[in-house]
Amino acid sequence: MHNARPLIIKSYLRSLPRHINGNEKIDALTYFAEGAAKCGDSASVTNSQTYETCDVGAIIGNAFDANPSKVRLPHYQVRKMVMDTQHSLHRYWLSIDSNVFIYKNAANPHKYLRYSFNGVFPATGIYCNETPGTENWNNMRRDYNMDLKPWRSSGNHILICLQRPLGWSMRGVDLMKWLKRTLSRIRENSDRPILIRWHPGDWKAFPNYKSTLVKFGVTVSPQNRHITEDLVNCWAVVCHNSTPSAVAPIEGIPAFITDEPAYSQGGDIANTDLSQIENPHMPDREQWIRKLAQCHWSFEDVRSGRCWSHMRNWVKVS
């Protein structure tokens, strides 16, 4: 052990909505506690809606959303309570979040999820991946039957991937104003066809923005179309900071982001200057993909304690 005493770990089941599909998120919290206990720490699952003293409080997701309809929800309040209390005590909260690689297999049979301390952006979270090994990436290559595709040598259209209009990940940037600025910047430097990909989890909001998109004179990818279809014959992908900034380079397509690189999972290798849309940088990706895989863990990794044995090295308590 790297600390003088066993750590106290709490997995907060009430960080989940009351009605959820399936048991994956419940299992994620439960297995995390099981794995930590196997490493010799005092770890347990709690159904409490009030704070329980701990060195590490595990939750699903985060509580960064400013949407008034969400901040009143009980599970959101539990998440915020854990995050705020741990922060005030200079302790740790652990986020169990979405899998960047899930586009490879939506069923996610090995239940890979992303684990980090104290934040979900690379800039704010501790991903425990500064010096990544090869084991996680090798496991994911095997389990997803995948590898890094060679950088593309040709392409036609530019794919712009939109984020949720009111999503916290936009970090306060208005989506339609962002799109207008981004389209203008691209058009200053390229006359390639532009395809817009709406956020797949937010099609209910699409009708509210459809007329604006029509005015921009762009083509919108159909609902339920897989991102790999939109990447066929693609020249480059553009987004603010979201998951496609990582998906595109895995598939051999250069990505451009408009946010600070440290707020994007693809930031280490992404382009940031849209004036270079016709001449994108395509760097070596090996270290980047190892870092990305290092913060993804399967249920087998989590339940066995392999995940916690690794992450525990970043927990410093007195």
Residues of each region from the PLM?
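N-terminal pre-catalytic "stem/leader" segment of glycosyltransferase-like enzymes
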Residues: 1-61, 167, 314-318
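Short loop/turn segments at strand-loop or loop-helix junctions that form parts
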Residues: 8-15, 60-63, 96-100, 155-167, ...
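Short, charged/polar "capping" segments at the starts of alpha-helices
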Residues: 16-24, 53, 66-67, 71, ...
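Extended catalytic core of nucleotide-activated donor transferases of GT-like folds
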Residues: 39-107
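Catalytic donor nucleotide-activated moiety binding site of glycosyltransferases and closely related
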Residues: 182-223
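A donor-sugar binding/catalytic signature common to diverse glycosyltransferases
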Residues: 224-270
